[in-house]
Swiss-Prot record:
The gene is atpD. It comes from the Bacteria. HAMAP family: ATP_synth_beta_bact. One of its GO terms (cellular component) is proton-transporting ATP synthase complex. This is ATP synthase subunit beta.
Length: 458
């Protein structure tokens, strides 16, 4: 255990001088004496000086304070003791329910599983959300991204997925709140508590108001806890909200460390940092990690370097669209932009595949006809096109669905629709079985039976 002293403080970046024969390694955790602060070594500047990032507030620190090297990376509690608890980036409890009482701690920096250890699978994960199950089905052990700008419903969709999957799925879940609103973290905790699944969830928060060090590392803390459950042979769900804030924290840290910015001001190590995180989120022969990540899209620009880098790592992408949200259709998932590797007849079967592609074809054709309708009106279309437009409008409305987590806001009770019912409903609309029903009947309902019942009342 070597000890050094603080020589410079610039915001969240602290330089510490050690004797030259005992300089800490990169990623070593250092403890400031007489303070609760933990520092993580980022650079060795030479002459025994290391540059570190503070995991927490730097208020009250001053030059000359003694700092001890722990000789290891930041470690966090893992295993069953973390379930039902809320922790910070260092694994300290923040739910005022006493110590964690863990039997084991793991370092947050770990190697990704080797190629030989990894396992792939094609088993589908049913979400109960029609548009997702139909157009961009999730794979068990896969990685999913929820892309969307500000206020189009990423967190609400994430909450609904957690409710539907975590409650229907009996395994363990880990939720990492990265740079998001504390209120949402609080809502989420109570949602889990009220649903009686809190004893199966570990919660790790590094919220918006925290220093960049916390936001940069909290995703790794959550991932480490998920890896432990996976290595014990469990199927784990890992929820990250929001992966963009992880990138943003990296940008802040990179600037403070004096690196040259690259495109749009992002850190030059953007792709590497994203890879380090994403490559660890994988399924092995022991167990699986299914991850669902919310991805904020700055200014609704999907070509921004941050979302563009994230795209490369995902098996399924759920793109939320402001245009669809403005029509009042929620969830505002864009069925033409959203993709999934599972959308393959060999994986999901011909029936599902043809229905999904049929829905996409009808919606794409409707999109093309919109210009003609806007200029010349519906009457100028051929009979076949008129029929297609009517079906497209029904499909568009049938893609909406009332959510369980939004019940308190909408007053409508939530609906869980099985994959079988979803396929049957859309197939019926495509085949013209419901051409006689008004399009309003399809808006904000669960299965197709509900639409038929609703039509009787209109």
């Amino acid at each position: 255990m070597s000890s050094g002293r603080i020589v410079q403080i610039i915001g969240a970046v602290i330089d510490v001088e050690f004797p030259r024969d005992s300089v800490p390694s990169i990623y070593d955790a250092l403890k400031v004496q007489g303070a609760e602060t933990t520092l993580e070594v980022q650079q060795q500047l030479g002459d025994g000086v290391v540059r570190t990032i503070a995991m927490g507030s730097t208020e009250g620190l001053k030059r000359g304070l003694d700092v001890n090297n722990t000789g290891a990376a930041i470690s966090v509690p893992v295993g069953k003791a973390t379930l039902g608890r809320i922790m910070d980036v260092l694994g300290n409890p923040i739910d005022e329910a006493g110590p964690i009482g863990e039997e084991e701690r793991w370092g947050i920096h770990r190697a990704a599983p080797s190629f030989a250890e990894q396992a792939g699978g094609n088993e589908l994960l049913e979400t109960g959300i029609k548009v997702i199950d139909l157009v961009c089905p999730f794979a068990k052990g896969g990685k999913v991204g929820l892309f969307g700008g500000a206020g189009v419903g990423k967190t609400v969709n994430m909450m609904e997925l957690i409710r539907n999957i975590a409650i229907e799925h009996s395994g363990y879940s880990v939720f990492a709140g990265v740079g998001e609103r504390t209120r949402e973290g609080n809502d989420f905790y109570h949602e889990m508590k009220d649903s009686n699944v809190l004893d199966k969830v570990a919660l790790v928060y590094g919220q918006m108001n925290e220093p960049p060090g916390n936001r940069l590392r909290v995703a790794l803390t959550g991932l480490t806890m998920a890896e432990k459950f996976r290595d014990e042979g469990n199927d784990v769900l890992l929820f990250v909200d929001n992966i963009y804030r992880y990138t943003l924290a990296g940008t802040e840290v990179s600037a403070l460390l004096g690196r040259m910015p690259s495109a749009v001001g992002y850190q030059p190590t953007l792709a590497e940092e994203m890879g380090v995180l994403q490559e660890r989120i994988t399924s092995t022969k022991q167990g699986s990690i299914t991850s669902i990540q919310a991805v904020y899209v700055p200014a609704d620009d999907l070509t921004d370097p941050s979302p563009a880098t994230t795209f490369a790592h995902l098996d399924a992408t759920v793109v939320l669209s402001r245009d669809i949200a403005s029509l009042g259709i929620y969830p505002a998932v864009d069925p033409l932009d959203s993709t999934s590797r599972q959308l393959d007849p060999n994986v999901i079967g011909n029936d599902h595949y043809e229905t999904a592609r049929g829905v996409q074809y009808v919606l794409q054709r409707y999109k093309e006809l919109k210009d003609i309708i806007a200029i010349l009106g519906m009457d100028e279309l051929s009979e076949a096109d008129k029929q297609l437009v009517n079906r497209a409008r029904k499909i568009q409305r049938f893609l909406s669905q009332p959510f369980f987590v939004a019940e308190v806001f909408t007053g409508a009770s939530g609906k869980y629709v099985s994959l079988k019912d979803t396929i049957a409903g859309f197939k019926g609309i495509l085949n013209g079985d419901y051409d006689h029903l008004p399009e309003q009947a399809f808006y904000m309902v669960g299965g197709i039976e509900e639409a038929i019942e609703k039509a009787k009342k209109l």
